[in-house]
Amino acid sequence: MAATGKPIVVVGGGMTGLAAAYYLRKFAGDAGIPARVTIVEASNRLGGKIETLRKDGFVIEKGPDSFLARKKAILELAADLGIDDELVPINPSGKKSYIVFRGKLHPMPDGLMLGIPTEIAPMLRTGLLSPLGKLRAGLDFVLPARKGGGDESIGAFLTRRLGREVVERIAEPLLAGIYAGDLDRLSLMATFPQFREAELRHGSLILGMRRAMRRRPAAGADGSPAARAGAEAEARSAASGNGAERSGAEPHAPSPADAILARFRGAPFLNFRRGLATIVEALERELAGADWRLGRRAVALRKGGAGDSGARYAVVLEDGEELAADAVIVTAPAWEAEKLLGDHVDCGMLRNVRYASVANVVLAFDKASFGREFHGSGFLVPRAEGRQITACTWTSSKWLHTSPPDKVLLRCYVGRAGDEDAVSLPDDQLVRLVRRDLEELIGVTAAPEMTEITRLHRSMPQYPVGHVEAMRDFRRRLAEALPGVWAAGAAFDGIGLPDCVRQARETAEAAIREWRDIAP
């Protein structure tokens, strides 16, 4: 790109920011618009929460561990980058998952979709619910739908439809785990709007989700937030009938993503053979001609370009440097976005997006001394169990590429909204607490050969009730106050990697459209 091209600044070097910068350069080139892209990242590394450790034959994800296969935005990006041949599916024999109840692992009942039962017999047989709890869940078939619109919490909605027992023992560990959140505070319409749609369309949440289950192959869910987030998106697409696979949708030519899905037919989640850092590294290579400001924090946005540049805006860095910009894409967390934009537009809704802190504790064992075989991919721990770990993925069982054949790799999750103290414990104490839970829950007494702890402070956005309307209003006022400035990322419209890529692409497209509209 020409150094004298139209200047654009992307604030944030995580998945959304890198993908936005990539698509800006791509779309600008396709449109014949010279563009000069600068990426500003406060830390000294790229990728945001994505970080892969490759060590001694292990491939260890320190952040997210996979992404939903059916959300095509990230597959299209992988194909564009030429890394789709590096994709790997989960182990087909490692899909079974469990829920802890009263200190014991219980198989997740068949027919669950996001914690919502779609088959009667498995729910009648499960030991997770009492007879009264099962009867209460059955009232969903006769209870009328709530009248009126408006948002409500996930917890309030599910309690109304299925009863508190189902919520606390089945739905909460699965759904709340996606956001490391509190179901009684998280927005229904920002997280699982398909639940409300099922209620309105079918008069029953169970019947609505049963139809969704029959339309799509079950995604399954294990202990990982990525798997839970993937299951959420899978069900959302199925229940709402969105996408080209919807009955009655017009046919379209197969895309690169369609070819990838055909290759991994039935695999709900994907990763890369050398870890998720593969896509970050590929984006960095493609952006070699961009300008970088690593370890430099953007602290202000000023109308009027830097110096005599004639640009619309100046992005001010903490060391005083000013970057001229005709367009700015802010992909930073909500509190950082508020600092940049708050002088120009009301950012109260960004202050309402609070963040939970979590930790990942990875333990590697020698298989010969481990003492047991795993048949499945992991387990979930309800909040009511009072454990330190919220979930555990049997990583070497779920992802065959992650460890040598003579080793066992486990990944445990600690921390959720309102229960985050353990995240900040010293390493030895945190490992001790995790090992205690593993011993009591699954009988693991062997000492790990290696541990790897990652603390992700303020990493999980908590969408409050009313989030969708608040963000729609915020974006409208942002466009009015600061034309050519956009905000995207996990704080706004979906926390999964595919959602971040989708937002990045949509924002880049909007920027190119605006440039065309205002071109003389």
Residues of each region from the PLM?
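Beta1/beta-strand and adjacent pyrophosphate-binding region of the FAD-binding site
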Residues: 2-16
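Feature captures the FAD/FMN-dependent oxidoreductase FAD-binding
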Residues: 73-110, 161-168, 286-294, 299-313
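Mid-domain catalytic core of redox enzymes
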Residues: 225-227, 241, 294-410, 417-424, ...
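Active-site/ligand-binding neighborhood in enzyme catalytic cores
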Residues: 116, 120, 134-300
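Conserved Rossmann-like nucleotide-cofactor binding loop
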Residues: 16, 45, 335
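Dinucleotide-binding Rossmann-like beta1-alpha1 core, especially the glycine-rich loop
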Residues: 56-145
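Glycine-rich FAD pyrophosphate-binding loop
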Residues: 25-55
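Conserved flavin/dinucleotide-binding core of flavoenzymes
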Residues: 109-111, 117, 373-376, 391-520
